[in-house]
Amino acid sequence: MAGHSKWANIKHKKAAADAKRGKIWTRLIKEIQVAARLGGGDVNSNPRLRLAVDKAADANMPKDNVKRAIDRGVGGADGANYEEIRYEGYGISGAAIIVDTLTDNRTRTVAEVRHAFSKFGGNMGTDGSVAFMFDHVGQFLFAPGTSEDALMEAALEAGANDVNTNDDGSIEVLCDWQAFSAVKDALEAAGFKAELAEVTMKPQNEVEFTGDDAAKMQKLLDALENLDDVQDVYTNAVIVEE
């Protein structure tokens, strides 16, 4: 992507994630419970559970914690009343934002999400108001210096749809979200370990923010991320660090 470093953004994202690992574990436990409740406790026949368990491994969550979460989900304890709700809205300058939640109290959650938007210069939108600006995909990012030709060959053979080299030298691989686990396994078997591997809502176009606007936008994103019921926040805003 011209104008900003995809690699710097990913490193910042990983550092932020490491700083709040306890919160990430809490979110993953909820996701594992819900996935197991809806699709069963076998990762081989439950793609959503497989994805959640892989995320837990990447976050260094102990296997005992993962097993307990699966058992609770299958048994119907805890998590049984969690409801998946997506909220859409806008940040400053009309930046698009998607907020995915798992909640046992939608009245509380919508109030908290709306408050975060309004407090930091954004506003809630209606269902579908910004989702069309994103694609639901599997995304992998590899460090600058990775062999582009070898990675492209392995990725396309694994079932990826697209391979892009960014201006900073990092390489992005995209696939259908349903094929994420299969592509991830194939790439790792070929010797390619991604620095970032996730199923995400990828914006079709990005909007860069600098200076004061970047600081304001970051505050809004942080406020949404820090809500207990929020699982993921997606945006087409790119915060450019100067």
Curated annotation (Swiss-Prot):
Per UniProt, which keywords does this protein have? Cytoplasm, DNA-binding, Transcription, Transcription regulation
Q: Where in the cell is it found?
A: Cytoplasm
Name the major location: cytoplasm
Query: InterPro entries this protein is in?
Result: Integrase-like_N, TACO1_YebC-like_2nd/3rd_dom, TACO1_YebC_N, Transcrip_reg_TACO1-like, Transcrip_reg_TACO1-like_dom3, YebC-like
Is this entry keyworded Cell inner membrane?
Answer: no
Annotated Gene Ontology cellular components are:
cytosol
Keyword DNA-binding present in the record's keywords: the answer is: yes
Coiled-coil segments on the chain, per record: none
Q: Name one GO biological process term.
A: regulation of DNA-templated transcription
Which GO terms fall under molecular function for this chain's record? DNA binding
What HAMAP family does the annotation carry? Transcrip_reg_TACO1
The record's annotation in PANTHER family points to:
TRANSCRIPTIONAL REGULATORY PROTEIN YEBC-RELATED, TRANSLATIONAL ACTIVATOR OF CYTOCHROME C OXIDASE 1
**What family is this?**
Belongs to the TACO1 family.
Record's protein name: Probable transcriptional regulatory protein Bcen2424_2294
| Native species | Burkholderia cenocepacia (strain HI2424)
